[in-house]
């Protein structure tokens, strides 16, 4: 479909995404996610539906049409739209959600916060691109606080609503995305310095206030102190990866049922157990290729909004992948985040594919500008004024000569 529509964007993004999705589907089938009488038949349509949605978004946003998401002028209307969607998702979740294993889910165990990632990235991209010059002008060591005030007010409300749900992982993802978008968008080093200081201070305060985060840090530092309780999931995942060795125990030969939430949070441990270090390393290589392409597309984007939007999406996927794999391998504390493409979850899959559709549209670039007739007429006029100089020559340099241009040597 993209080829028929004249797509001129990145040729690697879609194949790598298809490989990751295929691996995820294969692992979910092996885990028996689609088995059982209680399983919703709609789950079988999630992957093909997500692929069609990706293609639809990419086709709709081609030739620079993705810029319609930023609105017109200052983008004030678009800012209100994305802000209301973001706050509305969290408000509905707080009002109707149900708590399960430390997270708050919507009806049918949907996760509206997955859609929140995209709406917040769109809000930040619109906000920064409309105020790019102002955000780049600092007064000494102070950022432009007056320009930042609306963004900070929205951000405080957003983080407060997420903390009411004890969703520390989402708070971390969104704050890192904001920092990277500000840093790369304005190219001012001050954002990185302030962001690092604020992240360290906020992390210390949050761990001191929320017992949920404290227990996860304790289970990370000393899982054997409570091997049948808080440390059970980490220890089972590590045991499975250790038993997988280099080549694994074979596909469908492992016993991941002993690991809690193996089909979601700990799906990477299942892959490492069955396919070994080689299989899990190949999976990480595919993720690395995908994320590298996302950041490359962001760097080559022809508009500030396209660059910021692609940067935000790439950062969200990068941080989420890092937090999931890092938590499973005990490199960092568990965050309860899923692994994109691989873990079970319809909301996550839909959001990832819509995001990739937008990045594909950004990679397609702007429509080619036709040559104006005015420029051709000017070139023709210049040629008539100087008959000995071709019209296609470089400005300020003669590309040809006429008989009177050379000086004759003295006889």
Can you annotate each of these PLM segments?
Residues 49-53, 273-294:
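Hydrophobic alpha-helical transmembrane segments
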Residues 99-109, 183, 191-283, 301-309:
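Hydrophobic, glycine- and aromatic-enriched re-entrant/interface helices and adjoining loop segments
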Residues 164, 168, 172, 248, ...:
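Hydrophobic alpha-helical segments of membrane proteins
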Residues 1-166, 325-339, 344, 348-354, ...:
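Membrane-helix boundary/helix-loop-helix interface segments in multi-pass membrane proteins
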Residues 295-336, 342:
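Loop-to-helix entry and N-terminal half of a specific, functionally important transmembrane alpha helix
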Residues 145-208, 220-221:
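Hydrophobic alpha-helical segments of polytopic membrane proteins
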Residues 123, 208-212, 289-293, 317-320, ...:
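Transmembrane alpha-helix boundary/anchor motif
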Residues 25-33, 89-98, 183-193, 203-213, ...:
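Juxtamembrane membrane-interface segments at transmembrane alpha-helix termini
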């Amino acid at each position: 479909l993209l080829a028929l529509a004249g797509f001129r964007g990145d040729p690697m993004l879609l194949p790598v995404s298809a490989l990751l999705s295929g691996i995820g589907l294969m692992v979910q089938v092996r885990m028996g996610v689609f088995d059982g009488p209680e399983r919703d038949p709609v789950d079988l349509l999630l992957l093909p539906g997500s692929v069609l949605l990706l293609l639809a978004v990419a086709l709709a946003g081609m030739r620079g049409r993705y810029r319609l998401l930023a609105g017109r002028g200052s983008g004030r209307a678009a800012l209100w739209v994305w802000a209301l969607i973001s706050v509305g998702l969290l408000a509905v979740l707080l009002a109707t959600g149900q708590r399960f294993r430390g997270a708050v889910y919507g009806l049918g165990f949907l996760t509206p916060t997955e859609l929140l990632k995209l709406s917040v990235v769109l809000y930040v991209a619109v906000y920064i691109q409309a105020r790019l010059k102002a955000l780049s002008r600092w007064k000494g060591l102070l950022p432009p606080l007056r320009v930042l005030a609306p963004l900070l007010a929205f951000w405080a409300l957003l983080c407060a609503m997420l903390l009411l749900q004890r969703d520390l992982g989402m708070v971390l993802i969104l704050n890192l995305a904001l920092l990277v978008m500000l840093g790369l968008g304005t190219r001012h080093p001050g954002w990185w310095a302030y962001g690092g200081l604020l992240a360290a201070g906020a992390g210390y305060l949050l761990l001191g206030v929320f017992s949920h985060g404290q227990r996860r840090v304790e289970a990370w530092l000393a899982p054997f102190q409570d091997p049948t309780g808080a440390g059970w999931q980490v220890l089972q995942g590590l045991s499975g990866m250790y038993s997988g060795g280099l080549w694994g125990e074979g596909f469908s030969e492992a016993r991941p049922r002993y690991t809690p939430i193996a089909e979601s949070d700990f799906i990477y441990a299942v892959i490492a157990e069955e396919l070994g270090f080689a299989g899990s390393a190949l999976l990480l290589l595919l993720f690395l290729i995908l994320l590298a392409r996302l950041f490359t597309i962001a760097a080559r984007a022809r508009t500030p909004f396209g660059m910021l939007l692609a940067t935000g999406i790439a950062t969200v996927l990068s941080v989420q992948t890092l937090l999931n794999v890092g938590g499973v391998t005990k490199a960092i504390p568990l965050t309860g985040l899923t692994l994109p493409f691989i873990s079970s979850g319809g909301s996550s899959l839909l959001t990832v594919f819509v995001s990739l559709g937008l990045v594909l549209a950004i990679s397609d670039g702007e429509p080619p500008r036709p040559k104006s007739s005015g420029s051709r007429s000017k070139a023709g006029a210049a040629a008539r004024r100087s008959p000995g100089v071709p019209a296609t020559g470089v400005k300020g340099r003669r590309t040809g000569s006429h008989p009177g241009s050379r000086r004759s040597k003295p006889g």
